[in-house]
Amino acid sequence: LIFAGMSSLFSRVGFMVDAFSQEIKNPEEIFNAFDIRYVQHFLVVWSHLILGFVILVFGPFQFIPWIRNRWIKFHRWNGRVWLLCGAVTAFTGAFIGVVWPFTGHQGFGLLQATINAIIGPYTLFCLYKAYSCIRARNIGAHREWMIRSFALMLGVATQRVLMLVLIPLTGLGAEVMFASCMVLGMLINISVGELWIKLTRTPGTGNRHWKELDRKIAL
């Protein structure tokens, strides 16, 4: 999913660079309904893309146990940066999807706007809970809210993978499948995230990793 997200991100970056490298008098005549949003609202888009890149690159480091154990300062500072970038990216992503759904505010465009209006604030809530839990030294809950927030952020990558598979299979266009795959992608990631949390939850504050507990029981 990281690579799928990166592929989608670099595709949009390439489009933006190409679009602004040429003089275009009337963008409406050149770009389709999906692409023109990137041109007309480039400041919001660039902030979303750049900080999204930071999330995809540095996010996985937060979930590697030996980095947490050996380089705790890096883990803490990386976490702060990641939380900040995640908050801005969640807001800009929701803002774009709610205010400028590429099929308008009717039909599947309304579905796109609705799912963004739900997922955006929920992602911000997960990030807030992750921060507040670690401030309270509740490591177990912090870990769980971090998993939830990252699963939500990777939902767009899952959406893109689903679109690559389902559009050729169904013969339906992107106008229909974009919102549908977004809903399905988010549901898949939320479900997998919650399942992983349930399978790896530790008692108490979660200061010890579940594998360590299993080792002690085995011994």
Q: What does each of the following model-derived ranges do?
A:
Residues L1-L219:
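Alpha-helical membrane insertion/targeting regions
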